[in-house]
Amino acid sequence: EISCSLVGSEMCIRDRSRNSADTSLRIIHSLEYYDMDIGRMVLSGGEDISRYLSAFGVDLFLSCNENDVSNAIHAGFAAGMIYARDTKYSFPDNQIRIAFDADAVLFSAESEKIYQEHGLEAFNENEILNQDVALQKGPMASLLKSLSWLQNETKDLNVLRTAIVTARNKDTGVRVIKTLRAWNIVVDEVFFMQGAKKADVLACFGANIFFDDQDVHAGPASDVVPSARVPYKEGEM
């Protein structure tokens, strides 16, 4: 399990494992072998790791363990369940690229719930009617805010690029743009896919990671870029 925090202009990566302290030497040797710059470790011996996230100032928690990810989400942290793939991904040199879905990821699930319960037409009507009302923050909003700050701090280096890849169309996308303005956040690229498949666009963007709330999008995307599913909070949908 990997978490990261943004300190100053540096991104700190930490390993959080359910292994015991007795197994730590093998983990340390593996990190050295793969030349991974991870200095701080938590070996919880099987205990829930989410309780320690605040102590380490974590901005993002990633794991293949859905229960740990759900616990982190409920505790108020940006978190995603990574899809384990054997794919050898290709990444842009000297730049980190992070892509997000919109509803139930960057923004709350309020609009997604309308779509799930009442259909696309009701969703479109609601978003156009409320285009001047900013969407509520979702589980990844705090991460995007931190990334936006980091971009501003390192803008001369051009080491970070962000994108939104959403199933919304251009008309319902107006609310997305206005919400980002209200948050004083600039995203480099936005793709309003109108329900089209996201994987090809993500491959062209060259995402180092993509966050989506639905397996129907995150699953296929994980074949071309590292992807993580963001679970809903209990009772949210």
What are these regions (language model features)?
Residues 1, 92-141:
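Active-site neighborhood of HAD-like aspartate-dependent phosphohydrolases
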Residues 123, 139-141, 152-161, 169:
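Conserved acidic, metal-coordinating active-site core of Asp-based
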Residues 148, 163-166, 170-192:
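Eukaryotic modular interaction domains in large regulatory/scaffold proteins
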Residues 13-16, 38, 53, 57-62, ...:
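Short, structured motif recognition centered on aromatic/hydrophobic residues
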Residues 10, 78, 161:
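Residues at the starts of beta-strands that form the adenosine-phosphate
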Residues 2-8, 12:
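Single conserved hydrophobic/aromatic residue that forms the stacking wall/gate
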Residues 23-70, 75, 80-88, 178-212, ...:
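A cross-kingdom feature marking solvent-exposed beta-strand/loop segments within repeated
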